[in-house]
Amino acid sequence: MAVKKFKPYTPSRRFMTVADFSEITKTEPEKSLVKPLKKTGGRNNQGRITVRFRGGGHKRLYRIIDFKRWDKVGIPAKVAAIEYDPNRSARIALLHYVDGEKRYIIAPDGLQVGQQVVAGPDAPIQVGNALPLRFIPVGTVVHAVELEPKKGAKLARAAGTSAQIQGREGDYVILRLPSGELRKVHGECYATVGAVGNADHKNIVLGKAGRSRWLGRRPHVRGAAMNPVDHPHGGGEGRAPRGRPPASPWGWQTKGLKTRKRRKPSSRFIIARRKK
């Protein structure tokens, strides 16, 4: 994938960049693998805002992605197409299994149309194949990693991300996650070989406010621009200082306060915390 630039014939075009979509081979999604996606506007079932600055955006269909490839062990599939997915930063690959089933997976970097992929402990170590972590050699780059066996892929799913196998310790495999965190994950957890494709996603510049609105993002208002009733930083005459340690809209200390529970059971699996 490459990034496409524009001549600055308007102010918003000056720095705007878009993906060139050269890797996309099919424009319409597979009908059997899509379902409606209802917008919430950041509201919960009571109609109250639970996530601020969400709303609007282009209508989307949800593409059903296979994050549990262990239920097709030993069944080869051919990569039929690489498609765009509006619901994630990565591209998706349409697989045609030899038993007739079709599924979407996250498209790893280097996956080609016509290539054959397979899942299972005996699968060869090549891009797009899924195996339990204990069967993957140390140093291999993987993505779509399960945190618990049979629970579906949770880690390293965004564009350009990957985890690397650093070593083994009993039943567990030590992974370096995209954040830099070193973590133990059970060896029976499945992962897919390779890094997620569309690595240039991080170089996309929206260029104008309207493009954020197309994505369903509303303006992010600073607390200092609000009234005192709306935010701890609000109020004052003109540009007033905060007058207190920085706080969230709900009064929690922010800017550096650790929010992870001290006695969280999964902490025993974290060898080294993420890099700041």
UniProtKB/Swiss-Prot annotation:
What the entry lists under PROSITE patterns is as follows: RIBOSOMAL_L2
GO CC annotations?
large ribosomal subunit
What residue spans carry the Basic and acidic residues bias annotation? 230-240
Give the molecular function GO annotations: rRNA binding; structural constituent of ribosome; transferase activity
What are the entry keywords? Ribonucleoprotein, Ribosomal protein, RNA-binding, rRNA-binding
Alphabetical list of Pfam families matching this protein: Ribosomal_L2 (PF00181), Ribosomal_L2_C (PF03947)
Name of the protein: Large ribosomal subunit protein uL2
Instruction: Tell me the subunit arrangement.
Output: Part of the 50S ribosomal subunit. Forms a bridge to the 30S subunit in the 70S ribosome.
Q: Which InterPro entries match?
A: NA-bd_OB-fold, Rib_uL2_dom2, Ribosomal_uL2, Ribosomal_uL2_bac/org-type, Ribosomal_uL2_C, Ribosomal_uL2_CS, Ribosomal_uL2_dom3, Ribosomal_uL2_RNA-bd_dom
SUPFAM superfamilies documented for this protein: Nucleic acid-binding proteins, Translation proteins SH3-like domain
Q: Which family does it belong to?
A: Belongs to the universal ribosomal protein uL2 family.
Q: Where is the composition biased (Basic residues)?
A: 257-276
Q: Which residues form the signal peptide?
A: none
Instruction: Report the function annotation for this chain.
Output: One of the primary rRNA binding proteins. Required for association of the 30S and 50S subunits to form the 70S ribosome, for tRNA binding and peptide bond formation. It has been suggested to have peptidyltransferase activity; this is somewhat controversial. Makes several contacts with the 16S rRNA in the 70S ribosome.
Where does the record place the region Disordered?
Answer: 223-276
GO biological process annotation, one example: cytoplasmic translation
Q: Does the keyword Repressor apply?
A: no
Species of provenance? Thermus thermophilus (strain ATCC BAA-163 / DSM 7039 / HB27)
This protein's record includes keyword Ligase: no
